[in-house]
């Protein structure tokens, strides 16, 4: 078990940060090592609660799988986010999915969710769809945005 902190907002940035600690000629070996040994990665932000009292954790969760390991090993880090978006049943979650969940639960503001998003346009669209559904069907609506 290895726990560490890095200044990164998501899993892709964390892997990029790890690579930056090594000279470029060692990157392929580092990616191989990560693909074989990384079991999970969690990126967390603490955002202000909509009430102004306290903080709300939003988290990106990357869990190892054969496909994730292949993407890491081959250096195709840009493909990881798509796999995470489609793997919520396995426990994975992107930062943007977490932001939308916290907005739906009334814990963070739309402005805060959009400000902290990896893809502000996707989060803005998710918020708009949720708000339209809530106006049309009442507060019991629960729209999920998945890839």
Q: What label would you give each PLM region?
A:
Residues 1-147:
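Short, flexible helix-loop junctions that flank or precede catalytic/ligand sites
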């Amino acid at each position: 078990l290895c726990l560490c902190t890095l200044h990164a907002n998501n899993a892709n940035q964390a892997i990029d940060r790890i690579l930056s600690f090594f000279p470029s000629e060692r990157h392929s070996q580092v990616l191989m090592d990560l693909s074989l040994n990384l079991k999970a990665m969690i990126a967390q932000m603490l955002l202000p609660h909509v009430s102004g009292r306290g903080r709300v954790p939003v988290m990106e969760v990357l869990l190892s799988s054969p496909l994730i390991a292949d993407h890491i090993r081959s250096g195709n880090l840009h493909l990881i986010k798509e796999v995470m978006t489609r793997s919520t049943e396995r426990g994975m979650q992107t930062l943007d999915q977490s932001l939308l969940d916290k907005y739906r639960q009334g814990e963070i503001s739309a402005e805060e969710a959009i400000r902290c998003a990896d893809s502000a346009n996707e989060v803005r669209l998710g918020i708009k769809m949720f708000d339209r559904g809530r106006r049309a069907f009442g507060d019991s609506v629960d729209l999920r945005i998945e890839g």
